[in-house]
Amino acid sequence: MAPAARPSAAWRLVFALSLLLGAALPASAQTVATYHGHADRSGNFVMPQFTWARARTLHLDTGFAPRFTGHLYAQPLYWRPAGSTSGVLIVASESNVVAAIDSRSGATLWSRSLGPPAPLSTFPCGNIDPLGVTGTPVIDPASGTLYLDAMVLDGGRPHQRVYALSLGDGAVKPGWPIDVADALRAAGHRFDPRVQNQRAALLLLNGTVYIGFGGFYGDCGDYHGWVVGVPTGRPDHVLVWRSQARGGAVWAPGGIASDGRFLYFSTGNTFGARKWAGGEAVFRMPPSLQSSGGPSSFFAPADWRQLDASDLDLGATNPLPLALQGGAQPLLLALGKDRRAYLLDRQNLGGIGGSLVSRRVAARPILTAPALYAQDGSAKVVFQGRGADCPSVRDGDLTVLRIIPGNPPGLATAWCGAMSGRGAPIVTTTDGASEPIVWILGAEGDNRLHGFRGDDGTALYTGPPLQGLRHFQTLIAADNRLFVGADGRLYAFSLSP
């Protein structure tokens, strides 16, 4: 393992002070510590300067051009050490390079190589070459620790390893990394990293890091869906959930969501299952990952067999917890490659066929993470995908749904946005609710950053083409700017004075 580039003495002092003072600042002002900024994966960022009027002045900051090694699929993270005048951007690439970058100057504060990534030829199928870090890492601001999973080639064999790195200098913390196959073997399970891939964003909840695993593009080998919980204090004592049948991948880029009490995740298609065995489903799990298995703890569409046969699974998109105004029941939204939206009772997911509402909302399979915002007494959910009910004048690869309180709740298309590509959206508001703006990257499409008014879909901003965007790429909002990760580099967008 290569040593980290040595951070400056000034940076080491700032890092030490941040651990002492971190509790003094609200977390939202300091960090984008996880995928979509929140454990619930809402993707809603408070940015007081980002009004509808000023969004039209956004521009690419050409003076900000940090570089690193490797392709980038994981979302960047942002951490503001207490007492610091600038934040730190964290990127983790498919070359197994993790870098900390000053958010103002673009200077590299430290860089760490976790070891050689695995070439595609190592695996019986797949589409990422080489394969290193794919799932978005997670930050624990209280301890100044970054947790991530990496595929490392060691002794000619691939290994899934979970790392804990110091945010101060990138050093691997004592007791880490954890070899996933070894930890699961000690718990009585067989895990083969040659057919088990890690795409889902990591989640940190109550001192445990939760990691979803699935298969490779091509569905080769005897893989299963897994959720592995790694306690940060005892990383060799893992918690485990596994799909019963072959398949059932936990692979959505948004990973596992949480409302602070339970974990929510979706699974992909299974193979050869004569009775339902954990695929095509949404699960609610306690942090122990031990569930009764009753119908209140899972949902699967009634046509799960047909979805299995057609590879139209629910596993491509993370579930989204939401609540409507007026004290209505807490809900969970699931979106599928079957082009449907499913509204579920979060306290009773309903078992097979037990959704509150099921409606076709997209003209094509839905594949990326949704985002959530509130407006006019309803919840709005935005996803990348061509809507089923879009007006032709606004036809494009962005759809916003409106969820209306009621018994059952109402579900309708609010508006659609004209753009092309497969990024995942986020939302900025000035105070948590006002002047919402939907932002999305046209990754592997027009490759531009787009901004739309959240109330009616009016286009506010279309940026220049960007190089190196990978599908499902997700931007973040922090430090009065928007940051975009791409192969080997970061972009920043700023408002004009």
What is each of the regions a protein language model found here?
Residues D395-V400, P405-A424:
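Detector for outer-membrane/organellar transmembrane beta-barrel domains
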Residues P408, S496-P497:
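Short, charged low-complexity linker/loop segments at the C-terminal edge of domains
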Residues M1-A10:
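N-terminal secretory signal peptides that target proteins for export/translocation
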Residues Q30-Q290, P295-Q325, Q329-G351, L367-Q375, ...:
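Mobile, glycine-rich extracellular loop/lid and propeptide segments
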Residues R12-A24:
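Bacterial N-terminal signal peptides
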Residues G353-A363, A412-W415:
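Inter-blade linker and blade-boundary elements of WD-repeat/beta-propeller domains
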Residues L25-A29:
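Sec/Tat signal peptide C-region and signal peptidase I cleavage site
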Residues P7, L17, A183, E435-I437:
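Compositionally biased, intrinsically disordered low-complexity segments
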